[in-house]
A protein has these predicted regions:
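Catalytic Walker B motif of ABC-type/P-loop ATPase nucleotide-binding domains
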Residues: 161-164
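ABC ATPase NBD coupling module
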Residues: 65-83, 187, 229-230
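Conserved signature/switch motifs of ABC ATPase nucleotide-binding domains
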Residues: 135, 156, 188
């Protein structure tokens, strides 16, 4: 069980997150949707402490952090429990795809090279990159780099996987491979929080959808409830151009 309570964040005196509360069951995929500037990516960056929240707590099983009193040791523990896939990939340019995935396994998980290689190969295969494992990032397409980043995060087996636009750089024919990898990971008990503007991806993958408006969670429910039967007028307006696809 993951519980996020009263998460707040201000930039230049303006609240971008205002008392965010999210409860997530183990293995659940939660999608954050809304207009640009609603606070979706800020939530992910705050949870991973890449942005310092002004207040709030996160509880992961028996590990609880208060962001107002968080220690350096707690930050390190939190980042071991949360893995994040960024829009910008953040790969090591002078290391192969395989080595990019192996790195965290050897440094953080303290695995041997053979153990790390085995896991890295398995995760790259899941995202369709077995034939690219010895390629350097400069020889990979944007979509392939995104899948290496996803494989690297999944390889760490985090308590919570944070995904910021995981399909944004993928060719349409490759989106299904990533969706399957995410769905397979969820079935194995991988909890995820997803930010995406790809509503088809959200509808197919998410168990729960949270619609954000100006730093608030305006409405939440199943994909069908939010897409096809929203209660709030602003939610209805936002999904008006999408909902007919999912009736």
């Amino acid at each position: 069980m993951i519980s996020i309570k009263n998460l707040t964040k201000e930039f230049s005196g303006q609240k971008v997150l205002d008392g965010i509360d999210i409860d997530i069951e183990k293995g659940e995929v939660v999608a954050l949707v809304g207009a640009s500037g609603a606070g979706k990516s800020t939530i992910l960056r705050s949870l991973n402490y890449l942005e310092q929240p002004d207040s709030g707590t996160i509880t992961i099983d028996d590990f609880k952090v208060d962001f107002e009193t968080i220690t350096k040791e707690q930050i390190l523990t939190l980042r071991r429990k949360l893995s994040m896939v960024f829009q910008q990939f953040n790969l090591f340019e002078r290391r192969t795809a395989l080595d990019n995935v192996k790195e965290g396994l050897k440094i953080v998980k303290k695995l041997s090279d053979d153990e790390a290689t085995k896991i890295a190969k398995e995760e790259l295969a899941k995202v369709g990159l077995s034939n690219r494992e010895n390629h350097y990032p400069c020889h990979l397409s944007g979509g392939q780099k995104q899948r290496v980043a996803l494989a690297r995060a999944l390889a760490m087996k985090p308590d919570v996987l944070l995904l910021d636009e995981p399909t944004s750089a993928l060719d349409p024919e490759l989106v299904g491979e990533v969706e399957k990898s995410i769905a397979d990971a969820a079935k194995s008990g991988q909890t995820m929080i997803l930010v995406s503007h790809d509503m088809n991806f959200v509808y197919q993958v998410a168990d729960k959808v949270l619609f954000l408006e100006k730093g608030h969670i305006l409405e939440q429910g199943t994909p069908d409830e939010i897409f096809n039967h929203p209660k709030e007028e602003r939610t209805k307006e936002f999904f008006a151009s999408y909902s007919k696809q999912y009736l």
